[in-house]
Amino acid sequence: VYKRQVQEVAFGLANAISVLDAIEVAPEKMPAVFGRISFFCNSGIRFIGETCKMRAFTRMWDQLGRERYSVEEAKLRRFRYGVQVNSLGLTESQPENNVPRIVLEALGVTLSKDARTRSLPLPAWNEALGLPRPWDQQWSLRIQQILANETDLLENGDIFEGSKVMAAL
């Protein structure tokens, strides 16, 4: 059911491994190199799948750093990534319905504290119709500010820890 999410993790990690394995660097410098690798991910409307994807990405990257590349410092093993929400899913016929789509896609990559994105550009609600106007772009910024500053989303630990649904996936 979450084939796209599994593929995104697999391709992302495989690409990073191929780059890291090809780099000719002294073993003592590998942790610093590993710590500079970053990813750009997509977030779609499948909220549970997207949340699980980022949690898996984060944990697998940490494990890869420890076990394959002997990176001891946790800070250097941190999964560094930015996310673009899936603007391909925005509709032209009823653009006002894109608002909840964008918010759900943003929540999928921000709610899980250990897998929270550090960068989240959001599309404009009417982007399916054409280039956004300045007000439309400002609206996207306001969504980010509301999520970050007017809610308690960033004040809590991983609210999905212990979830049977998350553990099963």
Give each language-model segment a name:
Residues 1-2:
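Short, small-residue-biased leader/transition segments that mark boundaries at the very start
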Residues 6-30, 34-97:
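Gly/Pro-rich turn-and-neighbor structural signature
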Residues 12-22, 96-114, 139-148:
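Glycine-rich and small/hydrophobic secondary-structure elements
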Residues 34-38, 76-80, 104-106, 114-119, ...:
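Active-site lining segments that contact anionic ligands and/or coordinate catalytic metals
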Residues 40-42, 82-86, 102, 120-125, ...:
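Generic beta-strand/beta-sheet core signal
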Residues 44-47, 86-89, 107, 114, ...:
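Short, glycine-/Ser/Thr-/acidic-enriched flexible segments
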Residues 91-101, 131-135, 166:
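Conserved phosphate-binding loops in nucleotide/dinucleotide-binding enzymes
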Residues 115-169:
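Active-site or pore-adjacent capping/gating segments
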